[in-house]
């Protein structure tokens, strides 16, 4: 399978830029891994259906694969404690 291309939302790019260097390195390696296999993350359910989450230790990368365009849209990166609430807020515009 061809490696997917990453598309970062402005919010995801901003969040990655603010991470500590060791976490940033871990997140980048995890993104590279999910670009090779976009289905490797967990499917989200309920109001977050259609999105996936990839674990990077205590952090989560929330993304949406697009097989037709061979892209992966990275929506958010954050600590597992609050990333899903942040995603809900992002999706509802709050």
Q: Model features per residue range: what roles?
A:
Residues 31, 59-62, 87-88:
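Enrichment for repetitive, rod-forming helical segments
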Residues 1-28:
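Arg/Lys-rich, positively charged N-terminal/basic patches that mediate binding to nucleic acids
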């Amino acid at each position: 399978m061809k490696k997917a291309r990453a598309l970062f939302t402005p919010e995801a790019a901003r969040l990655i830029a603010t991470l500590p260097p060791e976490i940033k390195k871990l997140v980048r390696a995890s993104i590279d891994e999910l670009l090779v296999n976009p289905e490797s993350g967990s499917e989200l359910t309920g109001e977050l259906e259609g999105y996936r989450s990839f674990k990077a230790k205590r952090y989560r990368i929330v993304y949406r694969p697009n097989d037709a365009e061979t892209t992966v849209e990275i929506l958010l990166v954050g600590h597992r404690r609050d990333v899903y609430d942040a995603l809900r807020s992002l999706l509802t515009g709050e």
